[in-house]
Amino acid sequence: MASEVVIRRATAADHGDLCRVCLLTGDSGRDASSREDDPTLLGMIYAVPYQVGAPDFAFVLEDAEGVCGYLLGAPDTLSFQHFLEKEWLPPLRAGLTDPGPDPAAWQGSDWARDAIHRPPALPPIDLAAYPAHGHIDLLPRAQGRGVGSRAMDHLEAALAAAGAPGMHLQVSPENPRALGFYEHRGFRELCRSEDEVVVGRRLLDE
């Protein structure tokens, strides 16, 4: 019988687990271990900075076996981007070789190194309407049990309590399960590119 999953605030002691879950879900929801030569880089881009820069909106999901997922967010995407650029990314860049901007020359985790040296632009959406953003990833043992819905309820409530009128998420177009999950929760497509679909929903009544 599956053990109960609890939601708790993430701490600095969870950084290793944040990186682990990020890696194990980093290939459009699947395990990315076989393609990465640095198992921590995904987490250092997409997970750990939330515990450092937006700790009130960084949570882990935990069962009897340990951390089995996370829910992370920021109520103001522009402010969080400022934190990344001014505080988080500079020391990472100093310790990582720049692979150059040509994807044809990349190997292993070079795509992640490039994202650290040349972060992608914010999606072209109305950030006044959807200023908050979030990430949620669950290991397989936590999926299909209503845990994802409970986690999103928790994150959405935290962001709404902080005054965010709406939130958006970036989803891989190769992850139809996630896209269906967000559509079921009332998210609508805001924009789409070859690499991602951005979905959003209002959190507060206008």
Curated annotation (Swiss-Prot):
Quaternary assembly: Monomer.
Signal peptide region: none
Family of this protein: Belongs to the acetyltransferase family.
The N-acetyltransferase domain, residue ranges: 5-205
Entry protein name: Putative acetyltransferase OgpAT
EC numbers, comma separated: 2.3.-.-
Taxonomic source organism: Oceanicola granulosus (strain ATCC BAA-861 / DSM 15982 / KCTC 12143 / HTCC2516)
One Gene Ontology term of the molecular function aspect: acyltransferase activity, transferring groups other than amino-acyl groups
UniProt keywords, alphabetically: Transferase
Keyword Transferase: yes
Transferase listed as a keyword: yes
Alphabetized InterPro entries for the sequence: Acyl_CoA_acyltransferase, Glycosyl_Hydrolase_84, GNAT_dom
Pfam families hit by this protein: Acetyltransf_1
Record's function text: Binds acetyl-CoA, but not butyryl-CoA or decanoyl-CoA. May have acetyltransferase activity.
Gene3D superfamilies tied to this protein: 3.40.630.30
Binding site for acetyl-CoA: H135, I136, D137, L138, G144, R145, G146, V147, G148, N175, P176, R177, H184
